[in-house]
Amino acid sequence: DKREGSGDLLAGLPLWVCKTVGGTTVHWAGASLRFLEHEFKAKSAYGNIEGANLLDWPVDLNEMERFYSMAEDKMGTTGTHGIPRLPGNNNFKVMEYGAKALGYTDVHTGNMSINSQPRDGRPGCHQIGFCMAGCAIGAKWSTLYTEIPAAEATGRFELRSEAMVLKINHNKQGKATGVVYVDADGNTHEQKARVVAIAGNAVETPRVLLNSESSMFPDGMANSSGQVGKNFMRHMTGTVYGTMPGDVHFDRGTQMAGIVMDEVKNDPNRGFVGGYYMQTLPGFGVAAIAGNIGAMSVDSPGKWGRNYTQEVVENYKNMAGMWLVGEDMPQEKNGVTLHGSDKDQYGLPIPKVHFEDHANDVAMRNHAFKAGSNVYAAGGSKKQYQLPPFPSTHNMGTCRMSAN
């Protein structure tokens, strides 16, 4: 879908969402981490951070714990409810060795919503890899083959795929009464509803609210605060690859079943607030590494030619990879707005997404780059590559929840 990116985003803004039956649960890697206690109260925990639009959540970990537990049981999250963790692949073993050599202790294969053994009518993981392309056997939890088929089996559920909501209707009291949508054949319908649930991810959710303006809601529905579309976040991310002395074959096995959790603490003495995880990340193929290492690494071997062939292609089986992910700062200037003139195939203004890194994000990423490189060096790597963030993957914010 056409969209416009600005700031630190690529102009065409590729968003890693999945516009398909099952949504982004088809594409996700399955990592299922809880908020830490201090993350629910970011404003109180971090204080006044210049340029950040921090706010405490109106809920805390104690209130959310039972809901976390219910979700983990439903999804079969490893490391919870007596469910064994997934076995580590070579990519994890390399990271684990280096991390423990440096003194890290909280290192394991994580809490993954991927069956480590048969459960809930689904098989255990076969370690096929490429989890983000969809799970061929259904070991990874996704609504595509869990909740949606179960709902269809009741006879009281109708799935209308390839439909696009144009706007949300409301009554004189301002309560939503249904939606106007276009079906797969291009026909427009009005669907009345007692309840309208909006779950379009961090770009399409504010977009439909902003497109639902009316005389009662001139700035868009549910936008009395003026915060709809604002505070777009994507996590602090970055990637470190290391060329190891032996074969790794990091494309084999569960993609992100491996994590170092020691750095997720909130320790401002490191030069930033909040913390980050180091998680295993596989190769996405030689072509993808050409586009990432070749294009963006400071110490780049190039995207093609002899240096690229020698450093990347010939060493592909020896490469290990990790993803760095931490909390980024919400900023009011980062967000989703509607384009003034450019329209999509439905006649709706395309979304404009603006994002700029906060200084805290940059400081955290630099610390994480060094830590990740040190992990691989401790494992025997002589060469590490530090890659900037992917354009947009963990899309968050834009519809803020607060106490009032």
Question: What are the language-model segments listed below?
Answer:
Residues K2-T24, E39, N48, W57-D60, ...:
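FAD cofactor-binding and catalytic pocket of flavoenzymes
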Residues G5-A11, L36-E39, S44-V165, P391:
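Conserved redox-cofactor binding core of oxidoreductases
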Residues A29-A31, E39-F40, P118-D120, R207-S212:
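Short, solvent-exposed loop/turn and secondary-structure capping segments
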Residues T154, A163, K167-Q173, V179-R252:
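Glycine-rich loop(s) and the adjacent beta-strand/alpha-helix scaffold that form part
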